[in-house]
C-alpha cells in the first residue's frame, strides 16, 4: 500500500447527529451508536475510543482504525483579574485562533465567545482582528472544538444541570456567515441534546450583514441574532464597516425583519454599536439610531471602543458613554453598556488578534507601518 492510498481517519468531533448516524450506518452499525458516541465526546469530553465502555470491543477497535476525535491544541490559556478566560488554540495547518469564556451572575452564566475564521476579511476600521487579514475558514470541528476545549477545562461531566458553558456567542474572530457551511453544523451541535443541549436563545450569531446567507440561516436555524451596526447612516457605516457598500443598512434591516418573522417565538434583535470618540457618540447619532430602529423589536448593546495600535480612533470617556445610553433611554430604548472584560489579557471585544499566522498583503502592510513608526 502506498501513502496515496491511505484513507485519513474521520474526525468525529465536528459531525452533526445526521452525519454521525450516516457514518455508523456506513460501518454496518445501528443509528443509535451515533448518540452513544456523541455523548461520550460532548458530554464526557472523551477523546479515547477505548474508554467508551458501552461499545463493544470490536467496534472500539474498528473506530480506532477508521476515526479519531481531534480537537484544537491549547497553546496558551490565561485568566483575567475579572475571571475571564482566554485560550489561544492551534488548529489544522498551524494557524491560531482565540476563544474567550466570560463568567457572570456569580459564575452561573458562562458565555463563550467563539471564532469562525482565522483572521477576518471584512476589514472593519475599528476592529484589530480585521487588521490581521484573512487566512481561511475554520472547519466545523475547529469551531465546535472551541466549545469542547472550554467545557473540558472544568473537568466535570456535563448534563442539563451542570453546563460549564451556558451560552455561546459567535462573536470571535471572523464573519460567521462567510463560513456558513461550517458554522451551521457547529451550531447544530451546540443545540443538540447529544451535543451541548443549549437552547436557541442561548446561541447567538453576530453578523456584519451578509444578507443572502442571513436569509438562508432563517430557513435552517432560528438562533438568536446580533447585528454589528455601529452607525445609523450609510455614509458613516461605509467607513466603519466596508461590507455596507454591498449590503446597505436598509437592505440589512429588511433581512433582519425577515429573519425574526421566521423565528418560532418572540425574539428581539440585538444591535451592537461600538462607541468611538467623536465619530458616532454624539446626541444626533443616538437620535438617528433610535429613528432607524423604530419599527424593529431590538435591544442595543453599547460597546466602548477598545484602542489598538494605529487604529486612529479613541475610546470615549465613561461620562460620554453614559450620556449616550441616557439619550437612548429617553427615546424609549433598552441600551446596555457592555462591560469591558478581559482587556488585561487582550480578550476584550475587538482585541481578538491572537498570534494568527497570516501572510496576506494587508497584514504585511500593517506590520510594516508599526515598524516604521517605531523607528
UniProtKB/Swiss-Prot annotation:
GO molecular function, one term: metal ion binding
Cofactor: binding comment: Binds 1 [4Fe-4S] cluster. The cluster is coordinated with 3 cysteines and an exchangeable S-adenosyl-L-methionine.
Superkingdom classification of source: Bacteria
Reactions the enzyme catalyzes: adenosine(2503) in 23S rRNA + 2 reduced [2Fe-2S]-[ferredoxin] + 2 S-adenosyl-L-methionine = 2-methyladenosine(2503) in 23S rRNA + 5'-deoxyadenosine + L-methionine + 2 oxidized [2Fe-2S]-[ferredoxin] + S-adenosyl-L-homocysteine; adenosine(37) in tRNA + 2 reduced [2Fe-2S]-[ferredoxin] + 2 S-adenosyl-L-methionine = 2-methyladenosine(37) in tRNA + 5'-deoxyadenosine + L-methionine + 2 oxidized [2Fe-2S]-[ferredoxin] + S-adenosyl-L-homocysteine
Pfam families to which the protein is assigned, alphabetical: Radical_SAM, RlmN_N
Chief location of this protein within or outside the cell: cytoplasm
Domain Radical SAM core, residue spans: 106-346
Keywords: 4Fe-4S, Cytoplasm, Disulfide bond, Iron, Iron-sulfur, Metal-binding, Methyltransferase, rRNA processing, S-adenosyl-L-methionine, Transferase, tRNA processing
Cofactor: [4Fe-4S] cluster
Binding residue positions for [4Fe-4S] cluster: 120, 124, 127
EC numbers, comma separated: 2.1.1.192
Cellular component GO terms held in the UniProt record: cytoplasm
Family matches, as InterPro entries: Aldolase_TIM (IPR013785), Methyltransferase_A (IPR040072), RlmN_N (IPR048641), RNA_MTrfase_RlmN (IPR027492), rRNA_lsu_MTrfase_RlmN/Cfr (IPR004383), rSAM (IPR007197)
Active site residues per record: 98 (proton acceptor), 349 (s-methylcysteine intermediate)
Cystine bridges: 113-349
The keyword rRNA processing belongs to this UniProt entry's keyword annotation: yes
Binding residues for S-adenosyl-L-methionine: 174-175, 206, 228-230, 306
Keyword check for Amino-acid biosynthesis: no
UniProt record, GO biological process: rRNA base methylation; tRNA methylation
Class of enzymatic activity (EC top level): transferase
Compartments reported by the entry: Cytoplasm
Role of this protein: Specifically methylates position 2 of adenine 2503 in 23S rRNA and position 2 of adenine 37 in tRNAs. m2A2503 modification seems to play a crucial role in the proofreading step occurring at the peptidyl transferase center and thus would serve to optimize ribosomal fidelity.
Leftover remarks: Reaction proceeds by a ping-pong mechanism involving intermediate methylation of a conserved cysteine residue.
Similarity comment text for this entry: Belongs to the radical SAM superfamily. RlmN family.
Protein name, entry field: Dual-specificity RNA methyltransferase RlmN
Organism: Chromohalobacter salexigens (strain ATCC BAA-138 / DSM 3043 / CIP 106854 / NCIMB 13768 / 1H11)
Top-level taxonomy: Bacteria, Pseudomonadati, Pseudomonadota, Gammaproteobacteria, Oceanospirillales
Amino acid at each position: 500500500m502506498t501513502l496515496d492510498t491511505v484513507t485519513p481517519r474521520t474526525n468525529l468531533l465536528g459531525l452533526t447527529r445526521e452525519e454521525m448516524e450516516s457514518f455508523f450506518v456506513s460501518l454496518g452499525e445501528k443509528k443509535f451508536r451515533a448518540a452513544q458516541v456523541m455523548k461520550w465526546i460532548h458530554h464526557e469530553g472523551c477523546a479515547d475510543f477505548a474508554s467508551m465502555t458501552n461499545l463493544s470491543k470490536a467496534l472500539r477497535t474498528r473506530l480506532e482504525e477508521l476515526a479519531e476525535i481531534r480537537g484544537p491544541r491549547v497553546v496558551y490559556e490565561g485568566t483575567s483579574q475579572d475571571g475571564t478566560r482566554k485560550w489561544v488554540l492551534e488548529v489544522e495547518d498551524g494557524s491560531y485562533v482565540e476563544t474567550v469564556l466570560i463568567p457572570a451572575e456569580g459564575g452561573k452564566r458562562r458565555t463563550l465567545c467563539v471564532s469562525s475564521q482565522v483572521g477576518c476579511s471584512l476589514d472593519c476600521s475599528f476592529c484589530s482582528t480585521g487588521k490581521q487579514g484573512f487566512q481561511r475558514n475554520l472547519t466545523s470541528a475547529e469551531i465546535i472544538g472551541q466549545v469542547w476545549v472550554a467545557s473540558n477545562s472544568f473537568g466535570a461531566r456535563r448534563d442539563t444541570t451542570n453546563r460549564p458553558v451556558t451560552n455561546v456567542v459567535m462573536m470571535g474572530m471572523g464573519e460567521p456567515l462567510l463560513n456558513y457551511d461550517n458554522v451551521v453544523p457547529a451550531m447544530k451541535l451546540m443545540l443538540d441534546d447529544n451535543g451541548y443541549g443549549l437552547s436557541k436563545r442561548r446561541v447567538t450569531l453576530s453578523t456584519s450583514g451578509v444578507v443572502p446567507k442571513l436569509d438562508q440561516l432563517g430557513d435552517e436555524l432560528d438562533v438568536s441574532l446580533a447585528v454589528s451596526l455601529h452607525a445609523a447612516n450609510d455614509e458613516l457605516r461605509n467607513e466603519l464597516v466596508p461590507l455596507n457598500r454591498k449590503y446597505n443598512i436598509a437592505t440589512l434591516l429588511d433581512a433582519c425583519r425577515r429573519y425574526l418573522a421566521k423565528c418560532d417565538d418572540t425574539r428581539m434583535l440585538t444591535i451592537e454599536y461600538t462607541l468611538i470618540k467623536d465619530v458616532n457618540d454624539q446626541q444626533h447619532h443616538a437620535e438617528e439610531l433610535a429613528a432607524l430602529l423604530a419599527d424593529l423589536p431590538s435591544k442595543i448593546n453599547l460597546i466602548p471602543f477598545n484602542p489598538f495600535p494605529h487604529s486612529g480612533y479613541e475610546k470615549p470617556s465613561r461620562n460620554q458613554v453614559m450620556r449616550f445610553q441616557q439619550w437612548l433611554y429617553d427615546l424609549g430604548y433598552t441600551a446596555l453598556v457592555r462591560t469591558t472584560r478581559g482587556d488585561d489579557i487582550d480578550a476584550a471585544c475587538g482585541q481578538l488578534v491572537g498570534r494568527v499566522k497570516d501572510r496576506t498583503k494587508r497584514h504585511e502592510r500593517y506590520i510594516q507601518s508599526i515598524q516604521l513608526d517605531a523607528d
